[in-house]
Amino acid sequence: MLDSKLLRTELDETAAKLARRGFKLDVETIRTLEEQRKSIQVEVENLQSTRNSISKQIGQLMASGDKAGAEAVKQQIGTLGDDLDAKKVELDAVMAQLDAITQTVPNIPDDAVPNGKDDSENVEVSRWGTPKTYDFEVKDHVDLGEMGDGLDFASATKITGARFVVMKGQFARLHRAIAQFMLDLHTDQHGYTELYVPYLVNAETLFGTGQLPKFGQDLFHTEPLTEKASDEEPRRLSLIPTAEVPVTNLVRDTILDEAELPLKMTAHTPCFRSEAGSYGRDTRGLIRMHQFDKVELVQITRPEDSMAALEELTGHAEKVLQLLELPYRKVILCTGDMGFGSCKTYDLEVWVPAQKTYREISSCSNMWDFQARRMQARFRRKGEKKPELVHTLNGSGLAVGRTMVAILENYQEADGRIAIPAVLQKYMGGLTHIG
C-alpha cells in the first residue's frame, strides 16, 4: 500500500499521479476523514494531558490529609477516562475508514512508465528472433496435441470442467522438462535459491502481496474467506494464483540485515485462477487455464537497487526464451495496463504462429515498497538503528503451459511431429521429436 503520509501531506499530487493509471482517488472523502482524524487526535491528546496533570494532584491532596479532595479528583479522572475511551473509539473508527480506502489504492506508476488506457498503448522496447515461415499449413497447439494423443481437454472437462487439461505421455514429459530446464537455469546460472512452498495460503498472506481485499473474486477458496478463524474453526485458505504470493511473504514481519540483500528466490508451482473477468476469452487450448504451472522469480532488494534488479530479472526471463530459440518481443506496460501493486512492468510476448501474433508469456514487475509496507518487510543498514522497507520484485520465468504452446507451434513439422529444442533434449531422455 501507499505511504499514508502521501495521503496526508501530498494528497492532490498523489491523486494526479494515480490519475495517470485511470484511478480516481476520492480526495474529498480522504480530506474530510483526515480533518476528522486530526481534530479527534487533538482531543485525545488534550484529554490525556488533562488526566495526567490532574492525577498528580491526588498524591498532594493525600499528603495534606484532604481525602475528600483526593476522592473528588479520582472521580474526575474516571470521567476523563470514560471521555478518553470514547474519543479513542471515534479515532479508531476514522482510522479504519482511512485504512479501508488506502488498501484499495494501487501503486503510483514510475515516471518512466508511458501513459495509456489499456494494452493497445503498451510500448514495444525490443524484439529477439525472427518468426519462422512454413511451407505447410500451420496447426495450433490444440490440434497438434490431439494428433499426438498428448493433450486431452475432453477428459479434463469431464473430471473437473472447462479450462483444464490432461497431458499424456511425451507431452506430459515435455511439460515437466520445460519446468526443470527453467529451474536449472535460474539456480545454476542466475543465482536464485529454489524453494518448495505451500499451494494454500491464508488471508494475511494474500493481503501482503495485494490480492486482498480487492481481488478475492479472482481466487479459489477452500471456504468462504474471513480475515481470521477461531481456534475451533477450520482455517480458511486460498489456492495460490502465483508463487509470488507465498515466496514474497517469506519476508513478512521480518527485519533483514543489509548484507542479506538481495534475496533471489525461485519456485515452480501450479497456479490457480478463477479468471472471473475473462469469460469468452481464449477458451481454446492452454493459453488461459484455471490451473497452470509457472516458474516464478522473486527478488528482495534495497530501495536504490530495485530498478536495476528489474532489468536483471527481466533479462533472466528473456534468457529462457533465447535458449529455447523462441521469437519474442519485450514491451513496457502503459499506466492503464499495469497490475495493482506494480510501479513498472515489462511483459515478454512470445510468437504464436497459429495466431500470427505475440502473446504474453512473462510479466516482470518492480513493486517498489508497496508490498513491503503491507507485509512490514524491512531491512537494517549497517550502522543504522532504524529499519527501512525493502523493495520487492517478481516475474514469470516462465509460464510453463504458454512456453509449451510456443514450442509446439514454433517447432512443428509438416508431418505433425514436434522437434524438441536442443536445450530440452537431455531432459527428454535424448528424444529429438514427439508426436
UniProtKB/Swiss-Prot annotation:
The keyword Aminoacyl-tRNA synthetase applies. Pathway: Aminoacyl-tRNA biosynthesis; selenocysteinyl-tRNA(Sec) biosynthesis; L-seryl-tRNA(Sec) from L-serine and tRNA(Sec): step 1/1. Keywords: Aminoacyl-tRNA synthetase, ATP-binding, Cytoplasm, Ligase, Nucleotide-binding, Protein biosynthesis. It is found in: Cytoplasm. One of its GO terms (cellular component) is cytoplasm. ATP binds at R273, S274, E275, E360, I361, S362, S363. GO terms for molecular function: ATP binding; serine-tRNA ligase activity. GO terms for biological process: selenocysteine biosynthetic process; seryl-tRNA aminoacylation. Pfam families: Seryl_tRNA_N, tRNA-synt_2b. The keyword Cytoplasm applies. It catalyses: tRNA(Ser) + L-serine + ATP = L-seryl-tRNA(Ser) + AMP + diphosphate + H(+); tRNA(Sec) + L-serine + ATP = L-seryl-tRNA(Sec) + AMP + diphosphate + H(+). PROSITE patterns: AA_TRNA_LIGASE_II (PS50862). L-serine binds at T242, A243, E244, E296, S396. It is an enzyme of class 6 (ligase). Its main location: cytoplasm. Its EC number is 6.1.1.11. Consists of two distinct domains, a catalytic core and a N-terminal extension that is involved in tRNA binding. PANTHER family: SERINE--TRNA LIGASE (PTHR43697:SF1), SERYL-TRNA SYNTHETASE (PTHR43697). Belongs to the class-II aminoacyl-tRNA synthetase family. Type-1 seryl-tRNA synthetase subfamily. Homodimer. The tRNA molecule binds across the dimer. HAMAP family: Ser_tRNA_synth_type1. Catalyzes the attachment of serine to tRNA(Ser). Is also able to aminoacylate tRNA(Sec) with serine, to form the misacylated tRNA L-seryl-tRNA(Sec), which will be further converted into selenocysteinyl-tRNA(Sec). This is Serine--tRNA ligase. It comes from Vibrio cholerae serotype O1 (strain ATCC 39315 / El Tor Inaba N16961). The gene is serS.
